[in-house]
């Protein structure tokens, strides 16, 4: 039987009109926000860049290295802030404007290394929650797309308790915040000590307890390999992806940290190496970057970002690693973003002829004399060149 409809008076003529309770409130449909400009399905290759001196300078560094994405720290990663660690509104606006001008994206921020949301020690836990809250505030002010977080270490606590503490800490840190388009990514770990997150099931448990937050996963190749997942063979990579999909879900892997490993398979020791110079090997990275289940596509976002966290043992290693990834995905120098020749985060590389010219200039200044100091009381004899 149809429910009886209420009657209401027509305000124009007083006649009674049928009235349905469901008509009381019909909210306007919420428009789906347009995706960021960088989500165009193209490859996004980035590198962790330095914020020393000027945080906006990190953007120029990424562009000069030939990257179209980047990762940064938003503050010192190995220090607790002594006071306010907020970024001034003017600086944040300048950063956002510069990033838009360079067309870089996504912007990934890595959290402070000292944060340990799994700590059973009360003071450390309180400090970590506050620091993670500050990370969220800074990331949102800079317009970041992702905040990558190390889960933490239980330091003797049961794994289930450590996971519960991590999830609760994240929720507490984000309470009352407007995160905008920011998504928190839990990074897998190598399994050193009591670190949480070396098994995908552990990361899934964190995600299952933070469903009220925008969450995702950052998959680190070195950590994956060091934790015992063999990604160096075609069969091993397939098995690893088969382990990821039913747990955290490949559709929630938004960022991959692309690092070779200085330590062997299953070492549980976190040591990054330059691409092709470690135990994973260049060929394995080519297979991984071109895998249809990991490459840019409509899974989750319009594309994934591949971010380098490789060491700079000599000037130019950073630029060479970026170029190596572009080569591995089959994008040549002409198609990839143009890198500035000789640029490095450490210092600009000097060409052989430049070093020779510098030595000649030093000889002219020193008169060709040795570096030893002249004896006191004796006058130096200048030699004509």
What function would you assign to each model-found segment?
Residues 58-61, 91-98, 131, 135, ...:
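A general structural detector for well-ordered alpha-helical segments in enzyme core domains, enriched
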Residues 1-111, 115, 119-134, 331, ...:
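N-terminal pre-domain/capping segments
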Residues 38, 60-67, 86-108, 135-143, ...:
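Acidic (Asp/Glu)-rich catalytic clusters
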Residues 48-52, 75-77, 112-114, 152-154, ...:
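Active-site beta-loop-alpha junctions enriched in small/polar residues
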Residues 5, 10-11, 17, 23-28, ...:
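Histidine-acidic metal/acid-base catalytic patches
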Residues 53, 117-217:
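Active-site acidic/histidine proton-transfer and metal-coordination neighborhood
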Residues 62, 110, 128, 139, ...:
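Conserved, mostly hydrophobic/aromatic
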Residues 83-91, 119-131, 157-168, 194-202, ...:
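Alpha-helix N-cap and loop-to-helix initiation/capping positions
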